[in-house]
């Protein structure tokens, strides 16, 4: 029992207002079911191996799948991550290896959504924007062979107001810099060597960019995040957002 994850009263109170109303047959206890889902994602378990204390494993899986499809976890993350205005933003991307159970559809001729083969292994790519404290504000998923620019283009329209945005030289593009400036955000991005006119940037400020890398490290401590087992991209990104909610927002 001591090894089981269990939502506290305060944690449950922060997310419960976003739960869908139950209709018809009463659903399983929200605290235990959500705690069980978190336990499975963090430990990297198969659903059928979930501890019995959380209830039937099918209940855990069905709740996770149904609420992922309905966007419940996405709404919780979006609401909690947008309650204040960050002074600083950081953007980056990381690869997440796809387990054979997630990639197996490719062998049947139906390629799984958001899984690609950039260099050998099949994987997905997580694009993220975090604040100056290393807390994720925006998350999106693409196939592993997608460029950083694709992720930036997907996230840029949703950037919250901020003073600065830090990014590595992979994000050095005129369109991205111009978009940030239009939003009142100052880009702190080292220029590429082949840029005709080099652009100055705040090197002292840029040293803080490790926060986004640390954020990815904490997410990958969750085994079902570090390795993708979910065939459907909407359930995998839901798992990532659940991890982000638990680690930073409740």
What are these regions (language model features)?
Residues 1-250:
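Short alpha-helical elements
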